[in-house]
Amino acid sequence: MEIHPEQTALCEDLIAPCGMNCGLCIAYLGRKNEINREGFHRTYCEGCLPRGKGCLYMAGRCARLENGAVRFCSECPDFPCRRLRNLDRRYRTKYHMSMIENLRDIQKNGMEAFLRKEAERWSCPGCGEMICCHNGLCLRCSLDVLKNDKKYCWGIR
């Protein structure tokens, strides 16, 4: 598989402490693809770490993350904590991904192998751009689907 430099999932800085790959998030991909120019009204995000405010889901709720004692939740003796388990359950149910599995994969196989796996799993077969984990669409190839149904999520209408 050819790896395109613009693939957002291939950046370690976009892996949040909770295990979320921010490069697959609608707020990040929307910014990258400038979907608001197409009539959307979405909040854009650079990713949890690049925006300099830490993990969106754990910020202010985890002293170890706040004081820099850990980079990833998986480095914490309380891993996985209740908050992360709840977040993980929601993402597994709605968005076909698991933050806990991501973190365990990084622990077991390393960041480079994890990023390669993410690129293979989430690349659009049409253009190579990342598929959004929140709706299952490539925002480069399938933006018209989202225009017709702004609440589209993984084929469920």
Language-model segments: residues:
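Short, flexible, mixed-charge glycine/proline-rich loop motifs
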Residues: 9-16, 34-40, 50-54, 65-67, ...
